[in-house]
């Protein structure tokens, strides 16, 4: 029964990929779905790209163990800051300006907005380098649950996930990814809700589980009774950094903001904002809420020996075979949707912003699409190999890999990208300063971590600080560096002043 459900799911994904081939004949169609994707598909694509095994297995387990039920604040932050505010602040302006500048990727936006080829190439290099750790972490989270449910070797899990994702992305591009994301999102919503009910029921219900959690003590963390069932948990400061990284970070991630490029119209943005927020509240809030009860299983979990990534699989190990199958498909859905977004963002960036820009300026449309497809294969292959290497190395925490990736990307791009949509004063120098600061800080954190202040030794905290520092750095550097080309700036912002006729059902008029 478990295998039947799995193969049925695989068949649907591949079928959709083949069905969407007609939408992937040119660069605009392959990368952005022709900028005609509706609110439900866009919102679910955003949500499923946001939450993967990194959240469900890595973050929910680790932070639920560290902060107890207070870890749920991370899920609430993901919904309010990472989804609601991201759509409100970035969605509309980004859709308008990126279409006006004819940019399909984040580096292309920087290149057109600031009239800088080096800026475009620099951004593309950062994206390719730092998305790799994130993709490697996706496989690891999946392998633990696959091994528990089907007793399949880890290498088989990697090959299976890689091949399936490659097939439907190569065949149907962004549109296939968006439709599959919608199906995967429904599975995630149903799955997380069902699993929470089942786990709490196994512990006597919510009140009994909460009472049990309140009785858990850990002198190495805090001596206060009931700390793991408290409102802010044992370590509010570090919890705040988790909320910042996982919530604000989405504003600067290329695979996330690219969803706004493809949205169809004004009405779709309004609906998508609500749908995306509710999706995040259920999936992220539910995952962290579930992880908050991890210490009820402390008699069966050896964090020192098996790592935090073993917590959620242990919590789910007593569920029925059908529910375990649902869990596996849930995490598979989350991971594949995120992986597909990452490889589309990476391969399109390398083709459009690196290869075409530096080596093949006259590359034809069909060859660009072919290049993107080939790079999808290359990127998935590289991430698969790294996942195997990482599995056998000393880096065992999924959350740490994600912290490095998110910290470097969002630390580099969040501030210059957001300010460039709103301010005419942002300079190229301020963008470079943020690029170099964010990426260099995270690389230094990998190799020289013991020399960092204690609060910054965690890549999660370091990534959050990189983002916040960028928000301060860009305006300050812009004040003291040469002003941008006024004609270029006025042309970019002219898109907001263009007149558009709409029907009375959209606007009341005079």
Model-derived features with residue positions:
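Membrane-embedded helix-loop-helix hairpins and adjacent transmembrane boundary segments
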Residues: 1-510
């Amino acid at each position: 029964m478990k295998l039947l459900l799995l193969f049925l799911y695989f068949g649907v994904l591949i079928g959709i990929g083949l069905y969407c081939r007609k939408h992937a004949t040119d660069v605009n169609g392959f990368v952005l779905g022709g900028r005609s994707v509706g609110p439900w598909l866009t919102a679910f694509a955003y949500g499923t790209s946001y939450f993967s095994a990194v959240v469900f297995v890595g973050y929910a387990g680790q932070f639920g163990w560290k902060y107890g039920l207070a870890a749920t604040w991370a899920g609430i932050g993901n919904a309010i800051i990472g989804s609601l505010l991201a759509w409100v602040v970035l969605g509309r302006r980004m859709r308008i300006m990126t279409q006006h500048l004819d940019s399909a990727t984040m580096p292309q936006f920087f290149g057109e907005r600031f009239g800088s080829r080096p800026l475009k190439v620099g951004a593309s290099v950062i994206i390719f380098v730092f998305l790799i750790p994130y993709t490697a972490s996706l496989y690891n989270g999946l392998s633990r649950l696959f091994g528990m449910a089907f007793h399949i070797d880890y290498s088989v899990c990697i090959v299976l996930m890689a091949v399936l994702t490659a097939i439907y992305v190569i065949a149907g591009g962004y549109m296939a990814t968006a439709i599959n994301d919608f199906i995967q999102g429904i599975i995630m919503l149903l799955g997380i809700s069902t699993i929470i009910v089942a786990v709490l029921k196994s512990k006597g219900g919510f009140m009994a589980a909460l009472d049990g959690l309140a009785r858990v003590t850990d002198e190495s963390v805090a001596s206060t009774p009931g700390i793991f069932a408290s409102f802010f948990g044992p370590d509010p400061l570090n919890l705040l950094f988790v909320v910042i990284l996982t919530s604000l970070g989405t504003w600067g991630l290329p695979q996330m903001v690219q969803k706004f490029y493809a949205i169809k119209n004004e009405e779709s943005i309004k609906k998508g904002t609500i749908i995306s927020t509710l999706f995040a509240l259920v999936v992220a809030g539910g995952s962290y809420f579930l992880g908050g009860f991890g210490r009820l299983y402390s008699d069966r979990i050896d964090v020192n020996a098996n790592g935090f990534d073993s917590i959620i699989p242990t919590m789910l190990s007593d569920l029925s075979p059908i529910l375990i199958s649902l869990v596996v498909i849930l995490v598979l859905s989350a991971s594949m949707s995120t992986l597909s977004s990452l490889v589309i963002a990476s391969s399109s960036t390398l083709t459009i912003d690196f290869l075409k820009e530096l080596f093949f300026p006259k590359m034809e449309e069909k060859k660009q699409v072919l290049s993107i497809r080939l790079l999808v294969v290359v990127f998935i292959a590289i991430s698969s190999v790294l996942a195997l290497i990482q599995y056998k190395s000393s880096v065992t925490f999924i959350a740490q890999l994600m912290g490095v990736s998110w910290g470097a990307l969002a630390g580099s791009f969040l501030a210059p990208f957001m300010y460039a949509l709103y301010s005419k004063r942002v300079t190229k120098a301020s963008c470079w300063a943020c690029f170099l600061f964010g990426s260099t800080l995270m690389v230094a954190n990998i190799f020289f971590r013991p020399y960092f202040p204690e609060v910054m030794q965690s890549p999660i905290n370091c990534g959050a600080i990189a983002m916040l520092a960028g928000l301060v750095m860009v305006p300050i550097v812009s004040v003291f560096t040469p002003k941008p080309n006024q004609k270029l700036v006025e042309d970019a912002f002219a898109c907001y002043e263009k007149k558009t006729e709409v029907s009375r059902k959209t606007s009341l008029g005079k």
